[in-house]
């Protein structure tokens, strides 16, 4: 008889829940709920389990916020809860609450070739560290290492490191944004809001007033080639994505590969392929040759957060991935 666990991927707007076959890791019965419609995450879980008439003992839910202890308070939502109390209330034997990029990193060993698009570099080296990052509402970062037959995710808040310009244009962007907001982190330029910041800074650098555009407006105009400022912003976004990925590669020697997740890049995939991304990735001066062979992959799996939550839980329960 198949034994299932509950897995989830929760952001600021939606909660996506599914079942994971504990033996195989296969994800099924995925359903998305609006977080605005429920008073708590526990309430959403109860509705899901009732709707699917399934009894589970174990669960793992990825959430887009730092997980530093038993108390979880979501960054972009009013939900807050005790992991221990929620586990008790649901009658679970195991309940793991992990960072969303911990989940994405744990999905990597489960991905197949059709779930990836490669951008340069050679073949990944088995057993070497892996980096994963992705731009969406914010900039998520994690690393993954393989130790004693176990995958260990190294989560953190790497998206909030300093933005490090490496050209006159990027230095100009930093100067303008720093005058507006003070500290300029990588996330301030590598995210949906970050794309808007790039556009605004480009326009302001020419002593003009920027329009009130949303990220999707900038992307659409750039792809239609109807706005030179938008096209410059998107081009610069791609280059800085490359620089940041190269920084991650240098930091931990990620010869196992660098992986890009998140919802932004797939929206302009062909533009990204032709951009200066890989050039930015390898623009490391004396260490250009060091990163030259490191492959970069774009994850195109529909639900890496659910897949990784399942992988994390299965490993916790003693399965070898």
From Swiss-Prot:
EC no. given is: 2.7.1.2
Name of this chain's protein: Glucokinase
Under catalytic activity, the entry for this protein gives: D-glucose + ATP = D-glucose 6-phosphate + ADP + H(+)
Q: Name one GO molecular function term.
A: glucokinase activity
Q: What class of enzyme is it?
A: transferase
Highest taxon above the source species: Bacteria
Q: Which UniProt keywords apply?
A: ATP-binding, Cytoplasm, Glycolysis, Kinase, Nucleotide-binding, Transferase
Where does it reside?
A: Cytoplasm
Gene3D superfamilies, per database record? 3.30.420.40, 3.40.367.20
| Binding-site residues for ATP, renumbered to this chain | 8-13
A Pfam family of this chain? Glucokinase
- Identify its protein family: Belongs to the bacterial glucokinase family.
Q: Which GO terms describe its cellular component?
A: cytosol
- Entries under HAMAP family matching the protein: Glucokinase
Q: Name one GO biological process term.
A: glycolytic process
Asked whether the UniProt record includes DNA repair among its keywords, one would answer no
């Amino acid at each position: 008889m198949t034994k299932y666990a509950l897995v989830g991927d929760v952001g600021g707007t939606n909660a996506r829940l599914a079942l994971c076959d504990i033996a195989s890791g296969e994800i099924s019965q995925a359903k998305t709920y609006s977080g605005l419609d429920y008073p708590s995450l526990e309430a959403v879980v109860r509705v899901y389990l009732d709707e699917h008439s399934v009894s589970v003992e174990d669960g793992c839910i990825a959430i887009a916020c730092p997980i530093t202890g038993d108390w979880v308070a979501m960054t972009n939502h009013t939900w807050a809860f005790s992991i221990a109390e929620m586990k008790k209330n649901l009658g679970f034997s195991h309940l793991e609450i992990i960072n969303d990029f911990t989940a994405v990193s744990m999905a990597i060993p489960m991905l197949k070739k059709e779930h990836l698009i490669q951008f340069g570099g050679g073949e990944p080296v088995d057993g070497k560290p892996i980096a994963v990052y992705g731009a969406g509402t914010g900039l998520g970062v994690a690393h993954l290492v393989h130790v004693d037959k176990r995958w260990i995710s190294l989560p953190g808040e790497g998206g909030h490191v300093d933005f490090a310009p490496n050209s006159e244009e990027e230095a100009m962007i930093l100067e303008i944004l720093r005058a507006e907001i003070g500290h300029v982190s990588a996330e301030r330029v590598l995210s949906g809001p970050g794309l808007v910041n790039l556009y605004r800074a480009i326009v302001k650098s020419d002593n003009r007033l920027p329009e009130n555009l949303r990220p999707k407006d900038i992307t659409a105009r750039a792809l239609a080639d109807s706005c030179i400022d938008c096209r410059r912003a998107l081009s610069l976004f791609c280059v800085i994505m490359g620089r940041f990925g190269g920084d991650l590669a240098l930091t931990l020697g990620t010869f196992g590969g660098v992986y890009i997740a998140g919802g932004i890049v797939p929206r302009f995939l062909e533009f990204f392929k032709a951009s200066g991304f890989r050039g930015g990735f390898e623009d490391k001066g004396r260490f250009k040759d060091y990163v030259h062979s490191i492959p970069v992959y774009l994850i195109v799996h529909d639900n890496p957060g659910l897949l990784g939550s399942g992988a994390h839980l299965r490993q916790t329960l003693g399965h070898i991935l």
